[in-house]
């Protein structure tokens, strides 16, 4: 994207903040999923809230942001983040949890890993990060090069995306059948459940920008020393209405 080899790209809102901190000319122009998907998941029924993670082992895959997220949840619950033992499970979140290697995991998505565990007959305890002190953010966003954000084709894309999302939300099962027919190798019960869980999370107005949400999350990253400075919102996010 920075080299103008594509017009648009899909990424995560936290990554947009990191790009801005590095001085890359990438700007958020639209949103696909306007809710966090990240969760803390446990199978132990004694774990109901982050407060119950004191003295427990929590598996993670991505250092930095997941550690800051878990620490924030712990502080929100009134426990010392240092009382939680973090274990790197190398993206094997579900298997580590099922094998009892950890008491809980962070980084599992509410629309994927939580559904996978249910399909295996488990009853996971799912804690959404934004319910425990972590600022809400957009999970999936669309970025463009700063020099291209006012090109007409980007506005046209966002208009078409809004229409597509409207159809998707109005016809979740019908759209799933069309997708599965086009990609039969992906017709699994997990993908079906993930599809149905994800559809309500698509942004109904992809171009809309919640400025306060982005500024709050930027401050969260700065407070946790994940970015070197607080970058002005206009440097990395716009609303093209």
State what each model feature region is.
Residues 20, 71-75, 118, 180, ...:
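Class I S-adenosyl-L-methionine
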Residues 217-241:
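C-terminal solvent-exposed extensions
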């Amino acid at each position: 994207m920075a080299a103008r080899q594509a017009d648009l790209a899909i990424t995560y809102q936290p990554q947009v903040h990191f790009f801005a901190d590095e001085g890359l000319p990438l700007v958020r122009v639209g949103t696909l999923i306007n809710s966090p998907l990240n969760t803390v998941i446990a199978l132990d029924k004694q774990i109901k809230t982050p407060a119950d993670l004191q003295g427990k082992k929590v598996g993670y895959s991505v250092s930095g942001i997941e550690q800051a997220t878990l620490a924030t949840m712990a502080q929100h619950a009134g426990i010392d983040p240092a009382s939680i033992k973090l274990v790197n499970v190398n993206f094997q979140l579900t298997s580590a949890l099922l094998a009892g290697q950890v008491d809980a995991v962070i980084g599992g998505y509410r629309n994927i890993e939580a559904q996978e565990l249910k399909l295996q007959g488990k009853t996971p305890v799912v804690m959404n990060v934004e319910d425990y002190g972590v600022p809400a953010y957009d999970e999936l966003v669309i970025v463009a090069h700063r020099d291209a954000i006012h090109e007409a084709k980007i506005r046209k894309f966002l208009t078409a995306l809004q229409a597509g999302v409207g159809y998707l939300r109005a016809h979740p099962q019908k759209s799933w059948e069309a997708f599965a027919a086009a990609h039969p190798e992906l017709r699994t019960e997990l993908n079906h459940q993930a599809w149905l869980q994800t559809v309500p999370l698509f942004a109904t107005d992809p171009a809309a920008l919640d400025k306060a949400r982005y500024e709050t999350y930027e401050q969260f990253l700065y407070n946790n020393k994940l970015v070197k400075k607080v970058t002005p919102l206009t440097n990395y996010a716009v609303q093209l209405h």
